[in-house]
A protein has these predicted regions:
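Nucleotide-sugar donor-binding/catalytic module of glycosyltransferases
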Residues: 1-117
């Protein structure tokens, strides 16, 4: 997919119990213009099983030892092509429709600056 609007990096390590909810929250945004990248730090729990379950929705995923969350995010950044890049910790999730709202704001030519948390 060339130049998607959103790139979402999901760093993960032994968080399989949260990972499925996180991935579903991204997939259920119903946005086609998105790439999902999962960087797993070599988990020993069920994380890889969860990742494989959603593999068809992912642009890229890897499960290998890393040096922590910052390293995972940097690995994910190297795979991103989106105009807007976000990382979503695997124990967090997106509210329904949140990416649609962000996309609408960024496409509004009357808005010069937007800040949120």
């Amino acid at each position: 997919m060339p130049n998607p609007f959103f790139s979402i990096i999901v760093p993960s390590y032994n968080q399989g119990q949260f990972l499925e909810r996180c991935l579903k929250s991204i997939i259920n945004q119903k946005i086609k213009d998105i790439e999902i990248i999962v960087i797993d730090g070599g988990s020993s729990d069920n994380s890889v099983d969860v990742i494989k379950k959603y593999e068809s929705y992912l642009k890229y995923w890897v499960s290998e030892p890393d040096s922590g969350q910052s390293d995972a995010i940097n690995k994910g950044l190297s795979q991103c092509n989106g105009q807007i890049i976000n990382w979503l910790p695997c124990d967090d999730y997106l509210e329904h429709g949140s990416l649609n709202r962000i996309q609408k704001i960024f496409n509004n030519k009357n808005i010069d600056i937007y800040c949120g948390s």
